[in-house]
Amino acid sequence: QVFDQACKGIYDRAIFKKLDRVCDDCYNLYRKPYVATTCRQNCYANSVFRQCLDDLLLIDVVDEYISGVQIV
């Protein structure tokens, strides 16, 4: 599911898809079920999502992802 109904910000399918992809890729990296679910908690505004950005070497675009989290 791309859209989390708990998120109260702007619904933008492209942003949700981009944020969700980070969690999917992070899950594929570690293969731990809690990574995928925890990464998506609180509309991606959590430390696991930030750690996934680091682990996936997305440091150079972290601000772009964090602004997406603030929108949703």
UniProtKB/Swiss-Prot annotation:
On this chain, the residues bearing D-phenylalanine are F3
Please list the tissues where expression of this protein has been recorded.
Answer: Produced by the medulla terminalis X-organ in the eyestalks and transported to the sinus gland where they are stored and released.
Q: Which GO terms describe its biological process?
A: circadian rhythm; glucose metabolic process; neuropeptide signaling pathway
Q: Which GO terms describe its cellular component?
A: extracellular region
Q: Which residues carry this modification: Valine amide?
A: V72
- Where are the annotated coiled coils located? none
Cellular localisation = Secreted
Record key words, sorted: Amidation, Carbohydrate metabolism, D-amino acid, Disulfide bond, Glucose metabolism, Hormone, Neuropeptide, Pyrrolidone carboxylic acid, Secreted
Record Pfam families: Crust_neurohorm (PF01147)
Q: List the GO molecular function terms.
A: neuropeptide hormone activity
Task: List residues modified as Pyrrolidone carboxylic acid.
Answer: Q1
Q: Which cysteines are joined by disulfide bonds?
A: C7-C43, C23-C39, C26-C52
The UniProt similarity line reads:
Belongs to the arthropod CHH/MIH/GIH/VIH hormone family.
Task: Write out the function statement from the record.
Answer: Hormone found in the sinus gland of isopods and decapods which controls the blood sugar level. Has a secretagogue action over the amylase released from the midgut gland. May act as a stress hormone and may be involved in the control of molting and reproduction.
Instruction: Report what the protein is called.
Output: Crustacean hyperglycemic hormone
Species per Swiss-Prot/TrEMBL record: Astacus astacus
